[in-house]
């Protein structure tokens, strides 16, 4: 009997130590996408760059005046984890790995389109960022995760990991987490290896190397990411469990005015604003500032924070997101605060006023101009994403579509000097409140907002 009881105890202990096959599964097997000898399973498409196998490596070689070239899998993949090693010869070009991508010979003039994980050996150092080839362009520039810019090593093989599960894409370079994108397009597509177009003889003949290419497609489990990685979330008015777990909150729920009020009282404006189809929109009053519904502000106050928001301008429109708004000034027009300018730079006259462009899109209004490139600005009528980070030490940054466009030290001597020569010099201690409301401005033009999210920093 003692022996039987001992055996029973051992059985029970072993049973509970075993993985529960009904609730947890090991990841499925890895499948090689490259046999080390041939290009079987791959097709060449778009461009004229050369692809061949050398010493167990796929080698792509640039060709002058060719468009972007791709070696793509014959198979289409939905959810997967992809790993490979890559090396690039030239620092004047770039490359990338297409994921869930497509080829449309008619509508896209024979071009590949879809998400691309960047290989960028330039001084910009955006390797591991996510680019939408031949469509929306940059989804995840590495200004959003500057610490990862040093992950890619020039002149040597770099291990790249890409995880596509559900509508999420995560990337790693040499085991360093880089990008996190939640998207609304392309749940499946091919995998591709890019050789970028070149236009000079000096750039021609440069090589890109790919090896150890393998994929996992079954029993997948999302990998953990550190708490401080910013998520580009293209699902309107939605937070992922990751974002919620790390302190993000929606300031606009997509349905109601909960959390917002008029600067003129404790209720939301009865006119001048509308909430419909997941948007909060300030309506036109023919450019008359605060003459219709007036500005709206959050009910809560914020001190150090990271706030991002999508905005869509109509032609010639002007608005803004202000921060550290106290409402103490009791102004008749728009309330006073530091302002992330939201503006149609081409059609609104304010873009030509102020000093050195400090009233243009994404600028710190009337104080610091945004240093931005046209190609990172989405057209009027399309969505752009603004972002403001105020750190606990009063360092402040503005971003436009994931690219940092300015930074400053709130309360510094330089800041005080800028205020002294601005329209705000009549307000004592302008911009220096310990905490304040977040404000959406009524400047008399129709502008829509969505996906307004905030994380308090400590």
Regions found by a protein language model. Give the residues of each.
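Bacterial Sec-dependent N-terminal signal peptides
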Residues: 1-26
């Amino acid at each position: 009997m003692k022996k039987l009881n001992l055996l029973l105890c051992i059985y029970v202990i072993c049973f509970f130590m075993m993985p529960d096959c009904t609730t947890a599964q090991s990841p499925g097997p890895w499948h090689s996408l490259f046999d080390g000898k041939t290009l079987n399973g791959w097709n060449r498409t778009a461009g004229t760059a050369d692809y061949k196998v050398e010493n167990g490596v796929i080698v792509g070689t640039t060709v002058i005046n060719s468009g972007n070239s791709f070696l793509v899998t014959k198979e289409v993949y939905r959810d997967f984890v992809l790993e490979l090693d890559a090396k690039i010869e030239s620092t004047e070009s770039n490359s990338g790995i297409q994921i869930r991508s497509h080829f449309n010979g008619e509508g896209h003039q024979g071009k590949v389109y879809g998400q691309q994980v960047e290989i960028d050996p330039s001084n910009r150092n955006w390797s591991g960022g996510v680019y939408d080839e031949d469509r929306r362009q940059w989804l995840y520039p590495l200004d959003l995760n500057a610490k990862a810019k040093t992950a890619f090593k020039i002149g040597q093989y770099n291990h790249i990991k890409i995880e596509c599960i559900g509508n999420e894409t995560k990337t790693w370079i040499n085991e360093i987490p880089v990008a996190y994108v939640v998207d609304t397009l392309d749940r499946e597509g091919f995998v591709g290896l890019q050789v970028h177009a070149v236009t000079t003889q000096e750039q021609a003949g440069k090589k890109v190397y790919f090896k150890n290419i393998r994929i996992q497609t079954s029993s997948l489990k999302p990998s953990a990411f550190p708490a401080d990685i910013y998520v580009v979330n293209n699902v309107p008015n939605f937070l992922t469990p990751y974002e919620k777990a790390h302190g993000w909150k929606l300031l606009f729920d997509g349905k109601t005015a909960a959390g917002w009020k008029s600067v003129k009282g404790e209720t939301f404006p009865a006119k001048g604003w509308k909430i419909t189809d997941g948007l909060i929109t300030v309506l036109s009053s023919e450019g008359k500032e605060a003459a219709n519904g007036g500005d709206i502000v959050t009910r809560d106050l914020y001190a150090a924070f990271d706030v991002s928001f999508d905005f869509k301008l109509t032609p010639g429109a002007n608005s803004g997101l202000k921060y550290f708004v106290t409402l103490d000034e009791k102004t008749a027009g728009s309330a006073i605060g530091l302002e992330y300018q939201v503006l149609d730079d081409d059609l609104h006259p304010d873009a030509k006023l102020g000093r050195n462009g400090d009233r243009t899109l994404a600028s710190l209004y009337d104080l610091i101009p945004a240093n931005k490139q046209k190609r990172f600005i989405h057209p009027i009528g399309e969505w752009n994403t603004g972002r403001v980070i105020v750190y606990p030490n009063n360092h402040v940054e503005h971003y436009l579509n994931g690219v940092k466009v300015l930074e400053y030290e709130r309360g510094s001597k330089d800041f005080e000097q800028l205020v002294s020569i601005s329209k705000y010099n009549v307000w004592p201690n302008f911009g220096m409140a310990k905490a304040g409301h977040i404000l959406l401005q009524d400047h008399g033009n129709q502008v829509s907002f969505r996906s307004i999210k905030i994380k308090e920093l400590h």
